[in-house]
Curated annotation (Swiss-Prot):
Residues 18-31 have a biased composition (Basic and acidic residues). Belongs to the AAA ATPase family. Residues 1-15 have a biased composition (Gly residues). This is Proteasome-associated ATPase. Gene3D superfamilies: 1.10.8.60, 1.20.5.170, Nucleic acid-binding proteins (2.40.50.140), P-loop containing nucleotide triphosphate hydrolases (3.40.50.300). The lineage of its organism: Bacteria, Bacillati, Actinomycetota, Actinomycetes, Frankiales. The gene is arc. One of its GO terms (biological process) is proteasomal protein catabolic process. Residues 600-601 are annotated as: Docks into pockets in the proteasome alpha-ring. Keywords: ATP-binding, Chaperone, Coiled coil, Nucleotide-binding, Proteasome. Homohexamer. Assembles into a hexameric ring structure that caps the 20S proteasome core. Strongly interacts with the prokaryotic ubiquitin-like protein Pup through a hydrophobic interface; the interacting region of ARC lies in its N-terminal coiled-coil domain. There is one Pup binding site per ARC hexamer ring. Upon ATP-binding, the C-terminus of ARC interacts with the alpha-rings of the proteasome core, possibly by binding to the intersubunit pockets. PANTHER family: AAA-FAMILY ATPASE (PTHR23077), PROTEASOME-ASSOCIATED ATPASE (PTHR23077:SF144). Signal peptide: none annotated.
Length: 601
């Protein structure tokens, strides 16, 4: 094979030189293409290797970009939500403002008073001085409307809302309820009479002649009963929580007033059987501070307890109308008399309930003075007859009694004091030594803190210690010694008399002495001393109380002062103080005495 191939080759090469060249060129071209492809592939491989090495960083970049885009998206979503909320709020505000504008643009609503209803659904109302028949909105229950009730009207004067009853207007006095039951005759502030309709609240409750009513004058309706403020200020209906056991030194006076007030009420049948009329009134008179008002309060409390025991009901009570005498006086003509009438009208109302009523006039001499004794006015000329007529009117009632208190009974009109009016007269005198011990025992009790030294003196016996304290201070107060001399009075006939502090003692003074001593004990303990009330404090308090009263007799009219203090009899024209001080006995001071007019000047 080599021989022929060589032969043919040598013959070909020598014979076809162009074919070899073309093949070589083809080979070179093919090799170049392959080299180019290899180079391209190598570049591709290198590029792929670079891309492969760079892919984690790109992934991180893409992840970071994705996170940024997500954050921007979340922020855009939040802004969108806020924008939506703002738009919604703005829309609501626009709606509200539109409603407000519409409301403000509406015509004003009116008010009227409902009068009556009809079967066709219409009603009568009183508005702007006119009585109109109008229709009612379906939202209003016509059946629930009451005569006199206030209603709201729209611009077409239709009822659109039911309201409450009127709460302002004028005050009038009820004279009588007319036969129809829904009308009343009233008296205005100018004493003019008119007929008004009664609103539902007054139809539902009892009203009596003399009640104060609130009316709306334009509609002519009365809406409610108004408490009598002018009487409420003068009257205390609550029964005071004071018992007889709290009053000292007045046993005989307490027994007298109990016989006069309690027995007629508690034993009505026996009184009726013996044809015995109960007293209409009681006068308690005597010096100031001796327990007149206290007795009157205790009577009401005791009577309430007795009523509860007899009736067996836990709500048994007695009414105590405490009239503040000077406050009854009024500068307007007829006002004082009117208030007296209202007081007794209140008493009759309470007595009609079957409970005892005590009408207590304190400082009775200030309003019921003897007629004709006035200097600048003659007001007593009408006040006294008004009281007399009211007391005589009490005769028809079983449960009302009048109690008066005064320290100038000589100034009260005699017509009030005669039998048949203030039948029983009880003098509440200044306490003597025995009564003073009883009063001291109400305030100085064994349960108080007692000074250890005083307590040790009686071997720790508290009762004995207290009794000794009381005995010692009473002896000091009532001793007719030089240091207890108070005044020397000269009477119009020339006689002279020495008065001691005991002659001006009272329950109020004893209470004040004990209070002083207790305050001394408190201060001594605060300053580091031993705790407890001691005899020394009581004696010192007694001396301080005496010294405070040194200048009290210095009045323009000594006779008037002496009468108020309980010293009755011959007229006093001169007073000389006898109180012994640090500089000895003071000289008597002359007191100008004016003509005895029987009046305070």
């Amino acid at each position: 094979m080599s021989g022929p191939r060589s032969g043919s080759g040598s013959g070909g090469s020598t014979g076809r030189p162009g074919d070899a060249e073309s093949r070589r060129s083809a080979y070179e071209k093919e090799a170049h293409e392959l080299t180019t492809q290899v180079a391209f592939l190598e570049e591709e491989v290198a590029m792929l290797r670079r891309r492969l090495s760079e892919s984690p960083r790109q992934v991180r970049v893409l992840e970071e970009r994705l996170a940024e885009v997500q954050a921007e998206l979340s922020s855009a979503t939040g802004q969108n939500d806020r924008l939506v909320a703002t738009l919604r709020e703005a829309r609501d505000q626009i709606v509200t403002l539109k409603e407000e504008v519409d409301r403000l643009a509406q015509p004003p609503s009116g008010y009227g008073i409902f009068v009556s209803r009809y079967d066709d659904g219409t009603v009568d109302v009183f508005t702007q001085g006119r009585k109109l028949r109008v229709t009612v909105s379906p939202s209003v229950d016509v059946g629930s409307l009451s005569p006199g009730q206030e209603v709201m009207l729209n611009e077409a004067l239709n009822v659109v809302e039911a309201r409450s009853f009127e709460r302002q207007g004028e005050i009038v006095l009820l004279k009588e309820v007319l036969e129809s039951g829904d009308r009343a005759l009233v008296i205005g502030h100018t004493d003019e009479e008119r007929v008004v309709m009664l609103a539902q609240p007054l139809l539902d409750g009892p009203i009596r002649a003399g009640d104060s009513l609130l009316i709306e004058p334009r509609s002519g309706y009365a809406f409610e009963r108004v408490p009598k403020s002018e009487v409420e200020e003068l009257v205390l209906e609550e029964v005071p929580d004071i018992g007889y056991e709290q009053i000292g030194g007045l046993k005989s006076q307490i027994e007298s007033i109990r016989d006069s007030v309690e027995l007629p009420f508690l034993y009505k049948d026996l009184y009726r059987e013996h044809q015995l009329k109960p007293p209409k009134g009681v006068l308690l008179y005597g010096p100031p501070g001796c327990g007149k008002t206290l007795i009157a309060k205790a009577v009401a409390n005791s009577l309430a307890k007795k009523v509860e025991a007899i009736t067996g009901q836990g709500n048994g009570r007695a009414f105590f109308l405490n009239i503040k005498g000077p406050e009854l006086l009024n500068k307007f003509v007829g006002e004082t008399e009117r208030q007296i009438r209202l007081v007794f009208q209140r008493a009759r109302e309470k007595a009609s309930e079957g409970m005892p009523v005590i009408v207590f006039f304190d400082e009775m001499d200030s309003i019921f003075r003897t007629r004709g004794s006035g200097v600048s006015s003659d007001v007593e000329n009408t006040i006294v007859p008004q009281l007399l007529s009211e007391i005589d009117g009490v005769e028809q009632l079983e449960n009302v009694i009048v109690i008066g208190a005064s320290n100038r009974e000589d100034m009260i009109d005699p017509a009030i004091l005669r039998p048949g009016r203030l039948d029983v007269k009880i003098k509440v005198e200044r306490p003597d030594a025995e009564a003073a011990r009883d009063i001291f025992a109400k305030y100085v009790v064994p349960s108080l803190p007692l000074y250890p030294e005083d307590l040790a003196e009686f071997d720790g016996n508290r009762e004995a210690t207290v009794a000794a304290m009381i005995q010692r201070v009473v002896e000091r107060m009532y001793a007719e010694s030089e240091e207890n001399r108070f005044l020397e009075v000269t009477y119009a006939n020339g006689d002279k008399e020495v008065l001691y502090f005991k002659d001006f003692n009272s329950g109020a003074m004893i209470e004040n002495i004990v209070a002083r001593a207790k305050k001394m004990a408190v201060k001594a303990h605060i300053e580091g001393g031993l705790k407890g009330l001691r005899m020394q404090y009581l004696l010192a308090a007694c001396l301080d109380e005496f010294k405070e009263n040194e200048d009290l007799p210095n009045t323009t009219n000594p006779d008037d002062w002496a009468r108020i203090s309980g010293k009755k009899g011959e007229r006093i024209v001169y007073i000389r103080t006898l109180v012994t001080g640090t500089k000895g006995t003071e000289a008597g001071r002359s007191i100008d005495t004016i003509a005895n007019t029987g009046q305070y000047l």
